[in-house]
Every structure is written in structure tokens, then in C-alpha cells.
């Protein structure tokens, strides 16, 4: 897997491995970033019935509280909801330093624009799904300053493999006349391919059980960094990239860990 971040995906399935980090890690990383950058009060917005949104929001809340921060407002919204003024009004009254709102790329611009229309100046943050140019296109100038966590930064190649991938993918994007930004999920997809190929080579077979057993011991220097797998098939990763939207583009801010 390359983009499935819910921890339950690999539980009880010894044939499933993934190269991305998982939501408990991502939520903690974002809480650490927020607290380390001066946020003491946070609001959290999540979507009812959405495992990604509710799970990531919960992990952020727990980690932020453990650091000594206060969750001053918790709001939820329904699937397909487009008017967020009521919950944002509640949040404005709570006066948070940061709003953590893990949600879809369809919902994100609506939350961002309506928050700014209400005069909310708090930093708005989310997880990896927000690294999508659709948000910038639809939220416009209101998206400036949004912060998110992601798996990869093309400006900082982790190794020679990453540099070669970036060069090749950039050439492909130019050829196809697409936006010159490499999605993190594409880098993760490439790493999934590298891990699978290495496991097949190590197994010397295409037998599924043999490949599974080989994956348990695979180590690759992938586009998103060094990758090995733990006993549940999750990637052993200890770092996330924090990006912000500045001048209409996603720009690297820093790296953060769970420590």
C-alpha cells in the first residue's frame, strides 16, 4: 500500500505491507509541530463517519493534550456538508491558535475560505490529503499559510534513487503538460514498486507466501527515504515533511518527528 494511513489496514492481514506512515504517527507529528511553534490552544474539525478524518483528529488531540496544549473546541460535520459557518463561529469564539481539520480536498477549500470570511486568523492545518493543488485553486489567496504533513519533498532528494525519480517524473509532467509538482503519493507508489521488486528478487519466486516472507526483511533506500517493515507490515518511518502554502505553491517548512 502507498497511501492507506489508517492503522487498522494492516492489522490481522500478514499479506499487507505499506510504505507510508500511519495516522497515529501523522497526528502526533502535527501536534508536535503546532506546539513547538507556539500553539497552546487548538480546535479540531472532523467528518462524521470518516475513519481517516476522525482517526487523525483523535490522534492529534491526544498528542496535543499530552504536550500540555488545550483543545478549546471540537466540531464535526456531515458528509457532503458545504456550509461550515456555524461550527466555525463556535471555533472563532474559542479563539484557538491553530485549527486542525483533516478532511477531503473537496471540503478543505470550503473550510479555509469560510474561516477567513469570518475573520478567523488562526493557522489552519491538516494531514497528507491536503497536498493537492485543487485546494490552492479553489481557496485562492485564503489558502496562504495553510500547514500540512506529507511523506516527501522533491526539493530535498533523500538519495540518488530519489534524484533520478524526480528528474524522470518532472520530464514526464512537462511532456504531458501537467502541473510541475510531484504528488507524494506518486513517490510512495514508486517505493511500493521498489519494495515489491526487491522482495520478488530476494524470494527467487513469485509465490505469494515467499514474497510475503521476503518483504519482512526487505530494506530499500527509496524515494521517500529508507524503508523497512515492522511486524505488522507498517513502514518503519520516524520523520514527516511539513509544508505550507506560500505564494500559491506548496513549500517545504521543516521536518518533524514524534519525539
Placement of each model-derived feature along the sequence:
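Flexible loop/hinge segments that line or gate small-molecule binding clefts
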Residues: 1-17
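Second-shell loop/turn segments in exported
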Residues: 14-20, 46-49, 89, 148-156, ...
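An alpha-beta-alpha
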Residues: 15-79, 98, 196
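Hydrophobic alpha-helical segments within soluble ligand-binding/sensing domains
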Residues: 19-43, 54-56, 83-85, 108-109, ...
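Sec-exported extracytoplasmic/periplasmic mature domains
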Residues: 32-40, 61-69, 89-96, 113-120, ...
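Extracellular/periplasmic bilobed ligand-binding domains
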Residues: 56-151
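Extracellular/periplasmic periplasmic-binding protein-like sensory domains
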Residues: 112-190, 244, 250-258
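Segments of small-molecule ligand-sensing domains
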Residues: 172-187, 195-249
Amino acid at each position: 500500500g502507498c497511501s492507506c494511513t489508517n492503522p487498522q489496514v494492516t492489522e490481522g492481514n500478514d499479506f499487507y505491507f505499506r510504505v507510508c506512515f500511519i495516522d497515529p504517527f501523522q497526528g502526533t507529528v502535527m501536534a508536535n509541530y503546532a506546539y513547538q511553534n507556539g500553539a497552546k490552544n487548538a480546535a479540531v474539525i472532523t467528518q462524521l463517519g470518516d475513519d481517516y478524518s476522525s482517526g487523525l483528529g483523535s490522534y492529534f488531540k491526544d498528542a496535543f493534550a499530552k504536550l500540555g496544549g488545550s483543545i478549546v473546541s471540537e466540531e464535526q460535520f456531515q458528509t457532503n456538508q458545504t456550509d461550515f459557518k456555524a461550527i466555525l463561529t463556535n471555533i472563532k469564539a474559542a479563539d484557538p491558535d491553530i485549527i486542525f481539520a483533516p478532511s477531503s480536498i473537496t471540503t478543505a477549500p470550503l473550510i479555509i475560505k469560510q474561516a477567513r470570511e469570518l475573520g478567523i486568523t488562526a493557522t489552519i492545518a491538516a494531514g497528507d490529503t491536503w497536498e493537492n493543488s485543487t485546494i490552492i485553486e479553489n481557496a485562492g489567496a485564503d489558502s496562504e499559510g495553510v500547514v500540512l504533513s506529507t511523506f516527501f519533498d522533491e526539493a530535498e532528494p533523500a538519495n540518488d534513487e530519489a534524484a533520478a525519480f524526480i528528474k524522470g517524473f518532472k520530464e514526464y509532467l512537462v511532456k504531458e503538460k501537467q502541473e510541475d509538482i510531484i504528488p507524494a503519493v506518486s513517490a510512495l507508489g514508486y517505493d511500493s514498486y521498489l519494495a515489491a521488486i526487491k522482495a520478488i528478487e530476494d524470494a527467487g519466486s513469485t509465490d505469494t507466501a515467499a514474497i510475503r516472507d521476503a518483504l519482512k526483511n526487505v530494506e530499500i533506500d527509496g524515494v521517500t527515504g529508507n524503508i523497512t517493515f515492522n511486524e505488522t507490515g507498517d513502514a518503519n518511518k520516524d520523520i514527516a515533511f511539513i509544508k505550507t502554502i506560500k505564494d500559491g505553491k506548496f513549500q517545504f517548512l521543516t521536518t518533524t518527528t514524534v519525539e
